[in-house]
Amino acid sequence: MSVSAAVAAASTSRTLVLARRRSPPASRVAATSRGRPFSSGPHPLAVSPATRAPAMATDCAAAAAAAGSKKKKEVLIFDAEEDLAVSLAKYTAELSAKLAAERGAFTVVLSGGSLIKNIRKLAEPPYLDSVDWSKWHVFWVDERVVPKDHEDSNYKLALDGFLSKVPIPTGQVYAINDALSAEGAADDYETCLKQLVKNGVIAMSQSTGFPRFDVMLLGMGPDGHIASLFPGHPLVNENKKWVTYIKDSPKPPPERITFTFPVINSSAYVAMVVTGAGKAGAVQKALSDKQTSSDLLPVEMAVLQDGEFTWFTDKPAVSMLQNK
């Protein structure tokens, strides 16, 4: 269903914080972006052998960096992708229960790529039966401007790997209008979001004036890009629009729509899910304190104004960080 067709069906209210419950014991690693020594102890969230590390990052605008805005991020490191998937499902299900009860709706933003495989445990017991899927409203942080049944479509990827396996109402899944141009699809998606804010389905950030999604489940490319915001591309500096478009993506297909950083950074929760040695360089840079505002990777520009940011990683992804 396109966004314009889906908005009419929607209506509800607001957001608060997750009281995190302690999970079964797991290993813990304490570190910061300044490279403090590692230590061990209990882990508050992961259900499997994992490590935890608060880290620092720089805000997305040079002005914020100049103001010395360094926000804490939590880093969870898992021995295996299976363990990561179990913990990510638990994290998302707990947020769903908490925020759906408080707001009457749960707004979830997905990315493409391996993220859909990583959330597969949500479509299995116990979550398949225990999650209130009727409260879910699903969006995409970016989308390729291709038909919905095209192999490059993030919608198709999510439909095949996740959405077809859980009972989320069709009218609460907000795909782009694939009959429009990239510019038209971006404008249409932003119009949809504004209507859903007006209806109370999506909260509005009081501090930023941008929509405040309950949780964004995001991935990162080996070059440090998130959404369709690529290193060195002018779109990383867009600070007015909610949704914009790109026609010269360095990664095919070239035409896409994407949320902007003000929207990403207004989220209540972000889970950055990154696995594999191929992304270790970008992870090391993102969690280092040596960056300057002139050489930030897009992933470093994801700094929540008033929310909680958690990295879900495996050991290969943080191998350069641990060896530092």
From Swiss-Prot:
Alphabetized UniProt keyword annotations: Chloroplast, Hydrolase, Plastid, Transit peptide
Catalytic activity: 6-phospho-D-glucono-1,5-lactone + H2O = 6-phospho-D-gluconate + H(+)
Transit peptide, residues from-to: 1-61
GO cellular component: chloroplast
GO biological process: carbohydrate metabolic process; pentose-phosphate shunt
Pathway: Carbohydrate degradation; pentose phosphate pathway; D-ribulose 5-phosphate from D-glucose 6-phosphate (oxidative stage): step 2/3
Superkingdom of the source species: Eukaryota
Protein family according to the UniProt entry: Belongs to the glucosamine/galactosamine-6-phosphate isomerase family. 6-phosphogluconolactonase subfamily.
Name of protein: Probable 6-phosphogluconolactonase 4, chloroplastic
Annotated source species: Oryza sativa subsp. indica (Rice)
Highest classification ranks of the organism: Eukaryota, Viridiplantae, Streptophyta, Embryophyta, Tracheophyta
